[in-house]
């Protein structure tokens, strides 16, 4: 069985973070492991508190994983401090990690910054160049490229600039301002659009975590990047189409929409 590792924060409500990652990886047929960067107290209406892991303990988690069950792919989500980013970069380099997918979580849905300036600098200098693919949304792509994105042409220019700057593939996720659910993958000097139909579901908590984890899962199984993106988009469409409705805010998706078997009912 292929394996995948998520390095991210814990979401106590189960809709995003490592909880969403583990569900996604399991649903996509790989064995999921996790290294936790932070504990959060949150639900569908917001985050009330964050308890950050120490660099030493994060390093211990990564050592424990890589020296026993080596991951076939690695997904990195929100990492809030430069010290933790340094630790991750050091360990991934030491263990020669492969198929690294970075979801550069930098901006909250409200538009507020989630990372301090030193953390942004560490992220861009140390983690992004290690990635096989980055998965920024529109606001994050604007930060990484230094460009304003208001249409498809702007999305193409920014995605191309990010790919050239960090030497990796970039999947820029539409949907924030343009293109409905169309995403743009840029790599090796060329761009490819992945078209998707917008699903009228207000419960979208954890969509970014889910997409990047699904891509990592398919890379772990040996799929090429284009196929991994196609399958990840199909999976997240299924999660949204299941129309799960939980909580008082923007609720979680149904990561196990396709789960069948004798243990499900009852």
Features from the language model and the residues they span:
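Conserved N-terminal subdomain of the carbohydrate kinase-like
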Residues: 3-6, 26-109
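N-terminal basic/disordered segments at the start of proteins
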Residues: 14-30
């Amino acid at each position: 069985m292929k394996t995948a590792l998520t390095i991210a924060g814990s979401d106590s409500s189960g809709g995003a973070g490592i909880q969403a990652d583990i569900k996604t990886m399991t649903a996509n047929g790989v064995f999921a492991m996790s290294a936790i960067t932070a504990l959060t107290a949150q639900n569908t209406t917001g985050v009330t508190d964050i308890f950050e892991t120490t660099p030493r303990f994060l390093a211990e988690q990564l050592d424990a994983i890589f020296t026993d069950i080596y991951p076939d792919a690695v997904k990195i989500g929100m990492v809030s401090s430069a010290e933790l980013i340094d630790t991750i970069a050091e360990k991934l380099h030491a263990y020669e990690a492969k198929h690294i997918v970075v979801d550069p979580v930098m901006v909250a849905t409200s538009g507020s910054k989630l990372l301090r300036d030193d953390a942004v600098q560490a992220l861009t200098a140390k983690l992004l160049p290690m990635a096989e693919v980055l998965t920024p949304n529109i606001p994050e792509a604007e930060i990484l490229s230094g460009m304003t994105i208001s249409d498809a042409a702007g999305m193409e220019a920014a995605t191309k600039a990010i790919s050239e700057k960090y030497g990796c593939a970039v999947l820029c996720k539409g949907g924030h301002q343009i293109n409905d659910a169309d995403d743009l993958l840029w790599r090796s000097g060329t761009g490819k659009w992945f078209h998707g139909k917008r699903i009228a579901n207000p419960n979208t908590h954890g969509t970014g975590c889910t997409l990047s984890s699904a891509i990592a899962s398919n890379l772990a199984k040996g799929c090429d990047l284009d196929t991994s993106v196609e399958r990840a988009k199909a999976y997240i469409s299924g999660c949204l189409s299941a129309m799960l409705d939980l909580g008082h805010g923007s609720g979680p998706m149904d990561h196990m929409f396709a789960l069948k078997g004798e243990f499900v009912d009852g």
